[in-house]
Amino acid sequence: MLTEQQINQLDWEKVDHLMPAIVQHAVSGEVLMMGYMNQEALAVTEKTGKVTFFSRTKQRLWTKGESSGHFLNVVNIYPDCDNDTLLILVKPIGPTCHLGNSSCFAPAASDWSFLYQLEQLLASRKSADPASSYTAKLYASGTKRIAQKVGEEGVETALAATVNDREELTNEASDLMYHLLVLLQDQDLDFSTVIGRLRERHEK
């Protein structure tokens, strides 16, 4: 959340007391929507932990998800360098767009957003009927089998690289990534945890 100093430095006069607020998925990085906040909306957002805007058409505060239940739970808020725009990192509950899309800017999803969506799909297969998909069958086969597949795909990826076959390397690396994501989900981990560890090591 914003510090007291950051709040005091916000330039409300410059934006006629309606500050643009860009909402971004805290994990996938996908830009979800943009709205406007007055000082009261920002205060409510900070207090409740749910993104609340000021509606220019209705001339009142409105909390995203108040009617649909698709709230935007705040992870953090950052001001830009001019203190006249806010970036709000969130974890959404359900789709953000009223059309049912994850983002109001869909289908402009980034590669990272796709990876997150794939991870969510793989997670949903953990409790599915093993006969319904290869992924569900893989989960049902147990951790040892999943780990074995990661090892096999790792070797095949390395072999593809040694013969300079870029097409095969791409295919094998894709298989490796898929099975690694399945293994992480099997262990109740997600890719953002791995990224966090890499970031920690980079900052040392």
Curated annotation (Swiss-Prot):
Q: Which HAMAP family match?
A: HisE, HisIE
Q: Which GO terms describe its cellular component?
A: cytoplasm
Q: InterPro entries from the entry?
A: His_synth_HisIE, HisE, PRib-ATP_PPHydrolase-like, PRib_AMP_CycHydrolase_dom, PRib_AMP_CycHydrolase_sf
User: According to its UniProt record, which protein family does this protein belong to?
Assistant: In the N-terminal section; belongs to the PRA-CH family. In the C-terminal section; belongs to the PRA-PH family.
Instruction: Give GO MF terms, alphabetically.
Output: ATP binding; phosphoribosyl-AMP cyclohydrolase activity; phosphoribosyl-ATP diphosphatase activity
Mention any Pfam family matching this sequence.
PRA-PH
Which portions of the sequence form the region Phosphoribosyl-AMP cyclohydrolase?
Answer: 1-114
Q: Which PANTHER family match?
A: HISTIDINE BIOSYNTHESIS BIFUNCTIONAL PROTEIN (PTHR42945), HISTIDINE BIOSYNTHESIS BIFUNCTIONAL PROTEIN HISIE (PTHR42945:SF9)
Q: Its Gene Ontology biological processes?
A: L-histidine biosynthetic process
What this protein catalyses is:
1-(5-phospho-beta-D-ribosyl)-ATP + H2O = 1-(5-phospho-beta-D-ribosyl)-5'-AMP + diphosphate + H(+); 1-(5-phospho-beta-D-ribosyl)-5'-AMP + H2O = 1-(5-phospho-beta-D-ribosyl)-5-[(5-phospho-beta-D-ribosylamino)methylideneamino]imidazole-4-carboxamide
Phosphoribosyl-ATP pyrophosphohydrolase as annotated region, ranges: 115-204
The gene name reads hisI
Part of which pathway? Amino-acid biosynthesis; L-histidine biosynthesis; L-histidine from 5-phospho-alpha-D-ribose 1-diphosphate: step 2/9; Amino-acid biosynthesis; L-histidine biosynthesis; L-histidine from 5-phospho-alpha-D-ribose 1-diphosphate: step 3/9
Q: What is the lineage of its organism?
A: Bacteria, Pseudomonadati, Pseudomonadota, Gammaproteobacteria, Enterobacterales
Protein name, entry field:
Histidine biosynthesis bifunctional protein HisIE
Q: What is its EC number?
A: 3.5.4.19, 3.6.1.31
**Organism per entry:** Yersinia pestis
- Protein location: Cytoplasm
Q: Which domain of life is it from?
A: Bacteria
Keyword list, A-Z: Amino-acid biosynthesis, ATP-binding, Cytoplasm, Histidine biosynthesis, Hydrolase, Multifunctional enzyme, Nucleotide-binding
Give, as one word, the top-level EC class. Answer: hydrolase
